[in-house]
Amino acid sequence: MQVFNFSAGPAMMPKVVLEQAQQELLNWLDQGTSVMEVSHRGKYFMEMITQAEKDFRQLYNIPENYKVLFLQGGARGQFAAIPMNLANKKGKTLYLTSGHWSATAAKEARLFTEVDEINILLDGKLEVGELDFSHIASQYDYVHYCPNETISGVEIVDVPNVGEAVLVADMSSNILSREIDISKFGVIYAGAQKNLGPAGITVVIVREDLIGHARKETPSIWNYEIQSKNSSMINTPPTFAWYLCSLVFKYLLAQGGIKEMAKLNREKAKLLYDFLDQSDFYHNVVAPKNRSLMNVTFTTNNDELNAKFVAEATACGLQALKGHKVLGGMRASIYNAMPIEGIKALIEFMRKFEAENN
């Protein structure tokens, strides 16, 4: 039985990447040792991480005046690192909230700086409203938002207008899923465990002029200047996770880069949303313009049926479809590594389940 993993994270990884890692596990680059065993400051590992950054920069066409850091602590760590590094001049920040994770980031930031919070969802709806904040953004050290909320399946495609202010984005769940203009952002950060690789690595893209202004009490592990000067290795990094990310970057380049992945992601999501829209049995309540390409949420008419759906889907090899405890229902996370065959298998099961239970 073929298994498709719809987990929101840690998520499905490209099969060819896992197969390469399997082949190299005991003998990496003919050294007779695993990549997990070599020195993180050794010649081969340093060459690997240098190439990984080059590949990542190529994928996103990252301008030269941006640093790329490979850190630890996940996006939650960055919830604290962002204000410690950036909230240093005006003493207050603006958080645009659209769901659980953007609200959680705002809550953490309040430990370090004054936070103004604006809920950008329209009243009672999973729909994003006005995104022009250029008239107020200049009074803040930065403006923070989360372009994809995994729990509700809300994605913000348009970049908020903040004028000349610093825009910060938590792209943990949609990084590398579509093309973006990096120059519109001051900082982009993302946990790896959805589209970049396994859990353990956090990528931070930060504009150079924003480095070097951390408050003095900022721990060195979160200080962008210190990490940048030390190649993201002031401590021993999660070497195996970094290695796997490097393989994912090469895989994405071989597929044609982000442009091709975005095309495939739109195709996958359209298949699933089109099926949901024609069904009276399943429901998705996100406004069409804000439907996530990465996390598709849906439900039946009652919790009992939802539980039955998840159990029977799991038995059929369609794993991790249970929705987040905050929202319930079901959630199909269809990141870059999910093949279109997985979407078709899910739709086939959904059609069968509807016929048997409607």
Swiss-Prot record:
Keyword terms, alphabetized: Amino-acid biosynthesis, Aminotransferase, Cytoplasm, Pyridoxal phosphate, Pyridoxine biosynthesis, Serine biosynthesis, Transferase
Q: Report the GO molecular function annotations.
A: O-phospho-L-serine:2-oxoglutarate aminotransferase activity; pyridoxal phosphate binding
| A GO CC term attached to the entry | cytoplasm
Where, in this chain's numbering, is L-glutamate bound?
41
Q: Which GO terms describe its biological process?
A: L-serine biosynthetic process; pyridoxine biosynthetic process
Which coenzymes or cofactors are required? pyridoxal 5'-phosphate
- The answer to whether the entry has keyword Cytoplasm is yes
Where does it reside? Cytoplasm
Summary of the function given for this chain in its UniProt record: Catalyzes the reversible conversion of 3-phosphohydroxypyruvate to phosphoserine and of 3-hydroxy-2-oxo-4-phosphonooxybutanoate to phosphohydroxythreonine.
Question: By its UniProt entry, which HAMAP family does this protein fall under?
Answer: SerC_aminotrans_5 (MF_00160)
User: Its quaternary structure?
Assistant: Homodimer.
Entry protein name: Phosphoserine aminotransferase
